[in-house]
Amino acid sequence: MQRFFSARSILGYAVKTRRRSFSSRSSSLLFDDTQLQFKESVSKFAQDNIAPHAERIDKTNSFPKDVNLWKLMGEFNLHGITAPEEYGGLGLGYLYHCIAMEEISRASGSVALSYGAHSNLCINQLVRNGTAAQKEKYLPKLISGEHVGALAMSEPNAGSDVVGMKCKAEKVDGGYILNGNKMWCTNGPSAETLVVYAKTDTKAGSKGITAFIIEKGMTGFSTAQKLDKLGMRGSDTCELVFENCFVPEENILDKEGKGVYVLMSGLDLERLVLAAGPLGIMQACLDNVLPYIRQREQFGRPVGEFQFIQGKVADMYTALQSSRSYVYSVARDCDNGKVDPKDCAGTILCAAERATQVALQAIQCLGGNGYINEYATGRLLRDAKLYEIGAGTSEIRRIVIGRELFKEE
Amino acid sequence: MPFLFDESSSPSFRSRNQNCLLLHLFCCSRPMKILVAVKRVVDYAVKIRVKPDKTGVETQNVKMSMNPFCEIALEEALRIKEAGFAKEVIAVSIGPSQCVDTLRTGLAMGADRGIHVETNSIFLPLTIAKILKSLADVENPGLIFLGKQAIDDDCNQTGQMVAALLGWPQATFASKVVLDKDKNVATVDREVDGGLETLNVDLPAVITTDLRLNQPRYASLPNIMKAKSKPIKKMTVQDLKVDIKSDIEILEVTEPPKRKSGVMVSSVDELIDKLKNEAHVV
């Protein structure tokens, strides 16, 4: 059966102005041939199908209406990269997931963030912690893109102090009644399946947290207004409201009271996969800056000939390459079963802070034009900043790493 | 049925026709194989630079890809297989060790196996055609697909030469291919200078593909992973007993002269003078 995405006319290619720059040649030491092919394929898909919508997604603060990006990505087998093949996944590891995340982020930061929340925060948590029945029920539609997934742990009064969450789950006959609010939930407005953490025992601290699978339409579960964000616009984020929401017994993820392990171990892998997001943004910065400095002339020469600009571009490049090496090495380790929370936090700490700086420099390289919203650089900066905050702020990441180093013998 | 025995023809012609008959029967009775030649070339989007020693174009650290017309050829072969007319699509590439990457792309698109004829020499179309003929003698495909030309040399010769060496019919610049399984005939629309020409070619045949024949598929992610386990057979020109001596020697490769800016002329006389004495076109 043929699967065709957008038209690929070779003539069209020859005529269209180059959107892709070849500075994306990452070290062949990072990837083997199959991984390079995988990266090339996702890159083509993302540039053809996602990148053209990026600007409009940012301007309108919503995904395109004329094309269903979720379904498109599902048809390209992007959602279930780490899910078993029996549910429609690819049965691959975090390295491949990071490759896909980077290339989608390069096309559009907002789409990548929503994609990351859907494919890693929701789908991967179900893969890692779900029972066979739960996986059978929820994974196929999530992996095909028919349903959108989300995860909610933070609350209006519990961000960094996530264990201090107040959302309550009272045990009743046949299940639990949930009451409370969740905040900054990516994909919240459109998700059909959500992983939600709540306190089954408010006196037990972290050991009182349980993870639940919530379905859209459950009585007592509603979403409040879409949040108006600085960046990542279009990646719908909202507040979740639980008012006496009944959740059946079989919707517990893992066991009652074991939620904190689901949460914390999930966070490690979430940080790793999301760390590929800022990598894509840094690459997009280079994609925008390099053609510009080759063609923009001042004082009779391309501005790319001037030392200051070359210095900036060199710094951007090395920031990207070094972050990339870190992220993919840690991804390899995780695929080999060696998950180190310090390194998982380290990858996103490193990549995110660098991405913000790279985006600032990208704006600077474009000068006055960098300040105009017609150019992508402004959006790249606004999108990059999110990664210093979401999935644990940079401060929390530093505490995770520093505390561990202090404790280790 | 093709005209097989012409009393006035030479023995070699007759024996070639006998081979054709055998192949013809062979193809009628068994589902056929399709051989697709794919070339590794400098990517279409790369800005070409000539090497300082003028022996050729810079290919070190330059992005290489499958020739776009070869992608179209492979896509057509895959569609024919999916329609049930062929049982196997074999991708073949001739060149250095990196050609394996090009073959892997072909396998990821859906080809069943690959053949890599490894060589570090630059071969011109006639040598490539001889190699492909040797492979066709071994594999006995019902169809050989090639791109109409490669974007690095624009020769537009290999397909035609392969057909001549094999004594097979050829349909070049194909913009539409329709197979008749029962009659063992391909009806091909060709894009020619005067418009569109429709040919019926008996199989086995050589078809070269033009731009508008199809749009090649993306290599899907599951297929990329499956391609890892598909076999690529390594061969050498010695294995195929091909004479690689070339009658053509590349003397020099230079960039075309830089385009000069236009000149405003003051009168028709001046224009004619320039056309005659500077541009030498009248």
Swiss-Prot record, chain A:
Binding, substrate: 160, 206-207, 261, 268-271, 391-392
Disruption phenotype: No visible phenotype under normal growth conditions.
Biological process terms in GO annotation: alternative respiration; branched-chain amino acid catabolic process; L-leucine catabolic process
Enzyme Commission designation: 1.3.8.4
Pfam families (UniProt xref): Acyl-CoA_dh_1 (PF00441), Acyl-CoA_dh_M (PF02770), Acyl-CoA_dh_N (PF02771)
Family: Belongs to the acyl-CoA dehydrogenase family.
Oligomer and partners: Homodimer.
Positions of the catalytic residues: 270 (proton acceptor)
Organism the protein comes from: Arabidopsis thaliana (Mouse-ear cress)
CDD domains referenced in this protein's UniProt entry, alphabetically: IVD (cd01156)
Keywords: FAD, Flavoprotein, Mitochondrion, Oxidoreductase, Transit peptide
The gene coding this protein: IVD
Protein name: Isovaleryl-CoA dehydrogenase, mitochondrial
Molecular-function GO terms, alphabetical: 3-methylbutanoyl-CoA dehydrogenase activity; ATP binding; flavin adenine dinucleotide binding
PANTHER family: ACYL-COA DEHYDROGENASE, ISOVALERYL-COA DEHYDROGENASE, MITOCHONDRIAL-RELATED
Subcellular location(s) of the protein: Mitochondrion
Function: Involved in degradation of the branched-chain amino acids, phytol and lysine for the supply of carbon and electrons to the ETF/ETFQO complex during dark-induced sugar starvation.
